[in-house]
Amino acid sequence: FENVLYPNIPSLLNSLKEQGYTLVIATSKPTIFADEILKYFEIHHYFDCIVGSNLDGTRSSKTEIIQYILNKYKDHDSSEFIMIGDRRHDIIGANNSGIDSVGVTYGYGSLEEVKSSKPTYIADSVEQLREIIINSK
């Protein structure tokens, strides 16, 4: 896999699950591949739902994926959702869907890319991400 599991992510996921958060993956990757990546890194069990693109190329934009998730969890208010992403399309998808977002600067996107997409919050570390999530509850 070309993916990297950032230090302290398993600890953060475990902490959020213990606090009762519902964790959902919203990825542009096909769902089946995202599922395999999560299993490879042994973090699959933290997630309640994994939503990606379909193998036929449909539901491929981040906005479509987030809208699908919001519809699936329509018993939750949109203010309860926060999109965490490292690329502009993650943040734009959140903005288009009316939910808060955290742009993380330690992923694949540059600081400039993340900032220019206007996230609600910016996190430079997993610890900052943890603080943002807990304080935005």
Model regions and ranges:
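Short beta->alpha linker loops
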Residues: 4-8, 29, 86, 106-109, ...
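Short, acidic loop-to-helix structural element flanking the phosphoryl-transfer center
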Residues: 1-25, 31-35, 63
